[in-house]
Regions:
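Short linear motifs in intrinsically disordered/low-complexity regions
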Residues: 13, 25, 29, 34, ...
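A general structural signal for well-ordered alpha-helical packing
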Residues: 36-40, 65-66, 90, 112
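Extended, low-complexity, intrinsically disordered C-terminal regulatory tails
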Residues: 41-75, 121, 129
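Alpha-helical scaffolding within the catalytic cores
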Residues: 75-81
Length: 179
């Protein structure tokens, strides 16, 4: 069974857990887009593996980003190539297993599944660094935004039905708004 399939099975088998974001993780999300924070709170409720947000896992200033770039931790230097962290649109996470931090791929994959499912349930779109084709960043999740910078929203319940065109004098579509 592949890691992705294991993570899906693990996520599907997860019961309501007792995990909560710790004080430090909450503080590390300061400056992060509220939609992504909401997704993180939902993810901790459904994840099969506890997780936290490291000190550099939320919003980053240009100086913080450049420092991490020079340490070789990130490919974005913060100036020429900005990170989504600099706009508050990304979070990094780590697994918390047996009282210790873990960056094992199977743990991070399961947690990413919880983030994706949470975003879907809340009507948002996220992108996981583990899905990137050229560079795998397993502990990274980012909020997909519109060109204007707003969180991309999708319908929580998809439907194949055609939208109704508003007609005058039709009780199903006639309302106060103009066509």
């Amino acid at each position: 069974m592949t890691d992705v399939k294991k993570a899906k099975v693990s996520l599907n088998n997860a019961k309501k857990n007792k995990f909560k974001l710790g004080v430090n993780s909450i503080l590390h999300m300061e400056g992060v887009n509220p939609a992504l924070v909401e997704i993180a709170y939902k993810a901790i409720e459904i994840t099969p593996i506890d997780f936290g947000i490291p000190s550099t896992g939320g919003y980053r200033t240009g100086i913080e980003q450049k420092f991490l770039f020079h340490k070789g931790v990130t490919k974005a230097d913060g100036l020429v190539k900005r990170s989504k962290h600099q706009d508050g649109l990304a979070l990094d996470f780590f697994a918390y297993v047996d009282g210790k931090g873990s960056w094992e791929p199977e743990h991070l994959t399961a947690i990413a599944g919880a983030f994706k499912e949470s975003a879907k349930q809340l009507g948002y779109v996220v992108e996981w660094g583990g899905d990137w084709p050229n560079f795998k960043d397993l502990p990274h999740i980012e909020l997909v935004t519109t060109p204007g910078g707003d969180p991309l929203k999708v319908e929580k319940t998809a439907t194949l039905a055609e939208p109704k065109i508003k007609e005058k004098n039709d009780p199903e579509t006639d309302g106060d708004e103009e066509v």
